[in-house]
Amino acid sequence: MAGIKIQEDACLVCNACSKACPTEAIEIAPFKTCTLCFSCASACPTGALVENNGKLIYNSSKCIKCGNCATACPTGIKKVDDRFPYSKGHCVLCEKCVDACPIDIISIPGKIDKPEREVTIPQEPIKVTEACVGCSECVPVCPVDAISIEDELAVIDTEKCIYCSVCAQTCPWNAIYVAGKKPSKRQKEIKSFTVTEECIGCEKCVEVCPGDMITYNREDLIVKLPEACPACHLCEQNCPVDAISLEVEYGSAKPVTEEGLVWYEDKCNYCGPCAIKCPLCPTNAINMINQKGLALPSRTKTDKDPEFRMCIRCGACVMKCPTGALKMGKITHEGKEYNRIEFSPALCNECGECVDVCPQDTLKLTGDEKKPLEGYCILCLKCIEACAKTKRNALGLQ
């Protein structure tokens, strides 16, 4: 048996599985699951974690919270904290994640094997597929206003598009693809999803839900909302009496680049030397929250999950700058010419328009006349050198 297997390219990031898991053995975007390799049991010095007939058994009374299990976990899902039962992140084969998944893409190989969904990734610079439901979630997140909704479908103006992929990362129904690749989805959390007494039982929300996740009980005249869903807001938008309220909090968009400085998410462990080394500090061309919740390079404590943001030199700020203070320059590395952001403080009027459109939220006004703007990358590659010293090689030149 091989633990929990999620078909990542089909996942809607609804988090139903992670909410259902009693031992926190699933994380979504980025994906981490327990594979039942039993490395944690082998590392446990007290027998609190043991393998028994292909299952992991945990005895909290024997746990000394040493953290050996978390250190040994190859996927990084195992964790130890002060919340009972202390050691978390191991699959107990309860199958609750399988039952919770609304699109049946979770398997437990050797026990429950679900057929993979066919996912065809368009090999075009940017493409909106037939999966688009016209929910418009992509429209407000586009930093250059390149997306509109026409005839209930998202339409992208390729003359404006900077291919930052924020739309693809945000799309609730996996309908947008950039550069022929599977998008690295943003984290999201439904903060509240409610229906009030104003509901008139018209069932419009049931009809428009693309995933058939909303039900209506005609006997009790009650609309039942799902505990977790892709959060496209169509139900809320179409309710004729505004009885549905959906509040969603998105994580930061991930830096996706095809050329120049490239971040390899699967290699990053959010350690931070790259952010600290960036010579524009405190201009923060790289922002990170490490595994301990420490924001770098500012070194301020947060309660956020690990994240990585960097200037991707997309040019949104350059396009928006009304004074010419920001422009796209060139730099040569290893005989190849790359784009980089160049800034002239004397031309900056501190209007903040560049800050508003930055898809990575790295640009900030400082109030310093000599250096009024921070957060742009000059492609010096000092971050790559710092990362290489950690032997992670999560940053590279491409």
Swiss-Prot record:
Q: Which cofactor does it need?
A: [4Fe-4S] cluster
Q: Which residues form the 4Fe-4S ferredoxin-type domain?
A: 2-31, 25-53, 54-83, 82-111, 123-152, 152-181, 191-219, 220-249, 259-291, 300-331, 339-368
What Gene Ontology molecular function terms does this protein carry? Answer: 4 iron, 4 sulfur cluster binding; metal ion binding; oxidoreductase activity
Q: Which InterPro entries match?
A: 4Fe4S_Fe-S-bd (IPR017896), 4Fe4S_Fe_S_CS (IPR017900), Fe-S_Ferredoxin (IPR050572)
The gene for this chain is: vhuB
Relay the cofactor remark from the entry: Binds 12 [4Fe-4S] clusters.
What keywords appear on the UniProt entry? 4Fe-4S, Electron transport, Iron, Iron-sulfur, Metal-binding, Repeat, Transport
What's this protein's name? Polyferredoxin protein VhuB
PANTHER family from the entry? ADENYLYLSULFATE REDUCTASE, BETA SUBUNIT, FERREDOXIN III
What does the entry list as the binding residues for [4Fe-4S] cluster?
A: 11, 14, 17, 21, 34, 37, 40, 44, 63, 66, 69, 73, 91, 94, 97, 101, 132, 135, 138, 142, 161, 164, 167, 171, 199, 202, 205, 209, 229, 232, 235, 239, 268, 271, 274, 278, 311, 314, 317, 321, 348, 351, 354, 358, 377, 380, 383, 387
What PROSITE patterns does the record point to? 4FE4S_FER_1, 4FE4S_FER_2
